[in-house]
Amino acid sequence: MSAASIAAALIAALEAAAAREAGGPCALASVNVEMLAAPATGEARVKTERKTRTMMFLSAEYLTAAGERIATAASVHKVIAP
């Protein structure tokens, strides 16, 4: 598992969570990924921090099976009107 694949997994998880939470498509406006440890196999967990009618703010963590935090991410998404 490389740092690039961890970043890609975090971004994919953030985009999927934003679309699911909004009930439709969203555009990724910005994302910040921070690597905190050496790359390892794990999974992304996403949390919605704030949601308005037109914008969503999410955060994510990439954790190993043992619970070690490998990376974090924060993103802003524009909700696209149906």
Descriptions of predicted regions:
Residues M1-P82:
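Terminal targeting signals and extreme-terminal segments of soluble enzymes
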